[in-house]
């Protein structure tokens, strides 16, 4: 689908955000370094993950509305 420039920026932001989110999730779930971090830092990273996931959902909804 061809998007207007301002819409394409949202699509690009969504794509980039999801790539960063996947890396963060992989780090949290699979990297032994994560387990060695202080509990407070682990909590902050998990909160960051949740915030990024929520942000991704908002962008997904905006993109869906482009074709509505």
Where are these regions (language model features)?
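Extended, charge-rich alpha-helical interface modules
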Residues: 1-68
């Amino acid at each position: 689908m061809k998007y207007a420039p301002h819409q394409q920026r949202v699509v690009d932001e969504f794509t980039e955000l999801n790539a960063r989110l996947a890396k963060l999730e992989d780090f949290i779930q699979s990297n032994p370094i994560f387990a060695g971090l202080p509990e407070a830092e682990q909590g902050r990273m998990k909160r960051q993950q949740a915030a990024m996931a929520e942000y991704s959902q908002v962008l997904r909804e905006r993109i869906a509305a482009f074709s509505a």
